[in-house]
Amino acid sequence: MNVLDASALLAFLFRERGHRYVESVISECCIGSVNVSEVLGRFSRDGHDPHAAYLKIEASPVEVVPFTGEHAVLAAALVPQTNSLGLSMGDRACLALSISRNCPALTADRAWSALNLPIEII
């Protein structure tokens, strides 16, 4: 199982750099609800109905995982390590889900490779 960051799902959806890799593992991925909101925000910003986009994500093999209190604590604990890299709350939410599930995090953000975490960053 891999945990998708919003950037990875957007790369897949918009056929950006790295989309072929995401396509090859998409059936073995989950994504946090915070990151789904980021993806839907992109659709909304571009004039598309975010609800329609959500229904397509929901119908895909990707499991949407709710953001929990455990994830909130993990994400907050990552602030000191991630602030200097410019990582957002959404980034930390993805990392928190990845840590809680002990699964690799799949992102298009190269800054994540500088992190020293107990998970693999792809």
Question: How would you describe each model-predicted region?
Answer:
Residues N2-D5, I31-S33, L87-M89, T107-R110:
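Histidine- and aromatic-rich ligand-binding microenvironments
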Residues A59-S60, V73, S113-L115:
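Short secondary-structure capping/turn micro-motifs that flank functional sites
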Residues V65-L106:
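Active-site neighborhoods of divalent-metal-dependent phosphate/nucleic-acid chemistry enzymes
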